[in-house]
A protein has these predicted regions:
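Intracellular coupling helices
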Residues: 5-16, 20, 285-328, 388-399
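Small-residue-rich transmembrane alpha-helices
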Residues: 34, 240-241, 325-389, 429
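Short, strongly hydrophobic transmembrane alpha-helices
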Residues: 6, 13-43, 406-430, 441
Length: 602
């Protein structure tokens, strides 16, 4: 305790330099802790499920245009076929559709916003999510939903939700048959509060189910204990060839924890860039603390000599500096806590995770590691130097004539600062490129409502007229999908009989000009049986020469005749996915995703 007493006395006398140390360490710790904790959280994604080591996602790789195109979206029957043919290796499988992000649900005339999905009765058992109440087998019936515990509390408070009615988009009533535990923040399903039955999708034809197209499903497979993933993938590859009878699609399983990295939602490259940035910041902060501490050597040399004359040994002096570093870091951590508390909302918005999730028990090792490393560098380096000051220093006049030790530290600081600013500039340039990349259509000032349907053409036309007559609406149109969300999966048959996976969407008659899609040739659709294609579609089909009038088909099913060719535009996330071949068919009713372009100012 005597060491701590002398340490506190020293800190009180040097309060000016200590304030600089606290602010410097506080800011550096805050940034470093946030960077390292966020990357630890990223690497911990989708490990929240029970026995996640046995949980896999079905990966489909399509081969066309002499290129391989991996996707986490697959054909509907894939999971069931795997389960039927590999019963000794597979414990359970499930199929979902992830189309209803930020959808509107109504209970007792109150509106709730949440992500929704469809799933079969094996979903919760396969994913390892606890069911609070209800029988998952109810998901075999149409118009049935399971809701999360949090959403159930918001909708029905203390009432029993089982048997209650919720209405999707004020149009489709469904019955609550169960409650499940909320998805954790490190789940890719986080924010999904509603699980609709897959039977509802079948009833309302929300996607094609078959081997001939409609790759619109996410499928998950839970392996039995002790089963090797590589062995299963070898058998699945042969199975896919037998079922599909073609070599244009490859199916395999990937661990659920690799989902985000495997399919470009996140990348190890960005993780390493941010880890490098965090390491550089941490190193510069530590060196800055060491430099400030050592610069006080001329003031503190005599005091250290006095301590040694009083019986303090090298270990005692070293311990005093460790105490000093610990106290300063304690105040710095209080500053960090103050900053995090006051800037909580913008930080959570930038990090895309709550601070509670960021500093959960699974990730607490990351901030603790930052603190320990900084303590070791900041405490041990100056502590060793000061502990070596001889006792005779009390009888000498200390001069700061030799300043060579400062130059290496200053060089490291300036070099590190230059590196940090250079790396930040690179990240900002990449971010600017991604966020401002030309997508080939105009989405500015466009508001939308999803899942809209009407019972008749007259009702549809009446609602369209009302919407377009609003004083703040400039124009309006509709489509089956939002271009910013990606398009549905579909298949086409080439002239030589080969089946290929492409993207498909329905456009209302005014949608192409509404989104300012440019035509390479031909005209817009104005009747059923007409379709639009993009330039990549023509390259895939080798139809660059005179495409107008050609017939597009999927096996024996005819999609329509080409009347126009659109210039290529982003069909998915332009930052990660190249332009995909697509065609658009005619949507004859004002429904689906209704989009309105608003007048300025809003």
């Amino acid at each position: 305790m005597r060491q701590l007493y002398y340490t506190l006395q020293t800190l009180i006398r040097g309060k000016g330099s200590n304030l600089i140390k606290i602010i410097s360490l506080g800011l550096g710790l805050a940034v470093s802790i946030l960077i390292f904790s966020r990357q630890a959280f990223e690497l911990n994604y989708d490990t929240c499920y029970k026995d996640h080591e046995r949980l896999c996602l079905v990966k489909t790789v399509w081969y066309y245009n002499n290129e391989y195109h991996p996707s986490h979206i697959t054909l509907g029957p894939v999971a069931g076929t795997i389960a039927e043919n590999l019963p000794d290796e597979v414990e359970s499988v499930t199929v979902t559709q992830q189309w209803w992000s930020n959808s509107a649900w109504f209970a007792n005339e109150r509106r709730f916003q949440t992500n929704a999905m469809t799933a079969d009765s094996c979903f919760f058992a396969t994913m390892g999510i606890d069911v609070v109440s209800g029988d998952p087998r109810e998901l075999n019936n149409p118009e049935v939903v399971f809701i999360s515990r949090e959403l159930a509390g918001s909708m029905f408070a203390d009432k029993n939700p089982i048997g209650q009615t919720v209405v999707y988009n004020k149009q489709m009533p469904m019955t609550v048959k169960g409650i499940f535990e909320d998805f954790p923040e490190n789940s890719s399903f986080y924010g999904s509060g509603v699980v609709m039955s897959l039977a509802t999708s079948f009833k309302h034809h929300w996607g094609y189910w078959g081997w001939g197209g409609g790759d619109s499903y996410m499928s998950f497979v839970r392996l039995r204990p002790g089963v090797q993933l590589d062995d299963v993938n070898t058998r699945i590859e042969k199975l896919a060839e037998q079922v599909r009878k073609s070599d244009d699609v490859f199916i395999s399983l990937v661990p659920i924890k690799d989902y985000r990295m495997e399919f470009g939602i996140s990348t190890m490259r960005m993780v390493w860039i941010l880890l490098t940035l965090g390491t550089a910041i941490l190193f510069i902060v530590a060196m800055n603390y060491v430099l400030i501490s050592i610069s006080a050597m001329n003031r503190r040399a005599k005091a250290i000599g006095v301590h040694k004359c009083s019986g303090a040994n090298t270990g005692t002096i070293f311990g005093m500096f460790l105490w000093e570093t610990g106290v300063i870091m304690l105040f710095s951590l209080l500053l960090v806590a103050l900053l995090l508390f006051n800037f909580r909302e913008p930080l959570e918005d930038m990090l895309d995770v709550s601070l509670a999730g960021l500093f959960s028990w699974e990730n607490i090792w990351a901030p603790l590691s930052v603190i320990v490393i900084l303590f070791m560098i900041g405490g041990m380096l100056p502590g060793q130097l000061f502990a070596r000051i001889p006792v005779t220093q009390v009888f000498r006049r200390y001069t700061e004539g030799k300043k060579g030790w400062k130059r290496p530290l200053l060089f490291v600081q300036f070099a590190g600062t230059s590196f940090i600013f250079g790396l930040l500039g690179l990240v900002l340039m990449q971010s600017h490129y991604i966020t401002n990349k030309e997508r080939g259509f105009d989405y500015h000032r466009v508001a939308y409502a999803s899942g809209v349907s009407f019972d008749s053409d007259a009702e549809s036309d009446a609602n369209r007229s009302v919407m377009l007559s609003l004083p703040y609406v400039e124009d309006g149109a509709c489509s089956s999908n939002l271009l910013t969300d990606g398009l549905s999966g579909e298949g086409v048959t080439t002239d030589n009989g080969q089946w290929m996976s492409i993207r498909w969407v329905e456009f209302g008659k005014d949608y192409a000009p509404f989104m300012k899609l440019e035509f390479a040739e031909g005209k817009n659709m104005d009747a059923p049986g007409q379709i639009l294609v993009n330039e990549t579609f023509l390259k895939m089909m080798h139809w660059e020469d005179k495409p107008i009038g050609r017939q597009v088909r999927n096996g024996d099913r005819i999609a329509g005749n080409i009347v126009g060719v659109l210039k290529d535009f982003a069909t998915s996330n332009a930052a990660y996915v190249a332009v995909q071949p697509m065609y658009a068919t005619y949507l004859d009713r004002f429904s689906g995703n209704i989009q309105l372009r608003l007048k300025e100012p809003f």
